[in-house]
Amino acid sequence: MTKLIFMGTPDFSATVLKGLLEDSHYHVLAVVTQPDRAVGRKKEIKMTPVKQLALEHGLKVYQPEKLSGSSEMVELMNLGADGIVTAAFGQFLPMILINSVDFAVNVHASLLPKYRGGAPIHYAIINGDKKAGVTIMEMVKEMDAGDMIAKASTPITDADDVGTMFEKLAIIGRDLLLQTLPGYLSGKIEPQAQDDSQATFSPNISSQEEKIDWSKSARDIFNQVRGMNPWPVAHTLLDGKRFKIYAVEVVNGAGNPGEIIEKTKKALIVAANQDALSLKLVQPAGKPKMSITDFLNGLGQKLKVGDYFGK
């Protein structure tokens, strides 16, 4: 039985961890995840999905603010683990830790060398890619630059957003890891080096990138909205206040960028630089998320054709 340390944080990681826990080839000695954080409008302290799953299985959980140089890292190095598996952990692993075990592999949600970094699924959708995927790779000092053990891909449809793709890729990543890890550990699978000249990067989404630029095409804004739903969420201004947009549909229409060109009891159409967008799911400042119909029956009643978003 291979003794593992698992490192991960969100639901994506928890899916991978669950697969390892259910596979009799592996014994998870401990789990490392990000510290509990305050989330949501009420700033409630919440544990990560990985911590929740680990506690349900009685596993030892470590939550260092920074792994490098921590007492937790020293403890981890003394556990006698054979290897480390990471999946969307959210911190760099010190080389001293990687070198203390026989192997260290990462489940990365992109088709490397494309989209190294912390937001690969977001950028795949924002950029209008037709497919996304998962790469199982060796851990090295450089971010997501290790040799590739296996890859698998799946289409991105117009109905997908970050939430749906995370769910799909978590399952693909779990299955790919469990299918290929035995062959990798036995030496039957030879890792392939990445072509660094083809590498692209997907850093965490900045607050500036969350803002909708209505002078872009409707298709580009559609991809931006999907590529930020359910987090960090694309937003614009309405009457000078932040207005979040979770879902839109591209429709025919013309007007000045950001201009409301059609309003009914059930629809609000906003012009982009090319075509227009029908808003579907929104969140006005200080209010919960709501359908466009609910918005138009409430706060949105005062809006009229010729009004603008983005101001």
Curated annotation (Swiss-Prot):
GO terms for cellular component: cytosol. It catalyses: L-methionyl-tRNA(fMet) + (6R)-10-formyltetrahydrofolate = N-formyl-L-methionyl-tRNA(fMet) + (6S)-5,6,7,8-tetrahydrofolate + H(+). Its EC number is 2.1.2.9. InterPro entries: Fmt (IPR005794), Formyl_trans_C (IPR005793), Formyl_trans_C_sf (IPR037022), Formyl_transf_N (IPR002376), Formyl_transf_N_sf (IPR036477), Formyl_transferase-like_C_sf (IPR011034), GART_AS (IPR001555), Met-tRNA-FMT_C (IPR044135). It is an enzyme of class 2 (transferase). Belongs to the Fmt family. This is Methionyl-tRNA formyltransferase. It comes from Streptococcus mutans serotype c (strain ATCC 700610 / UA159).
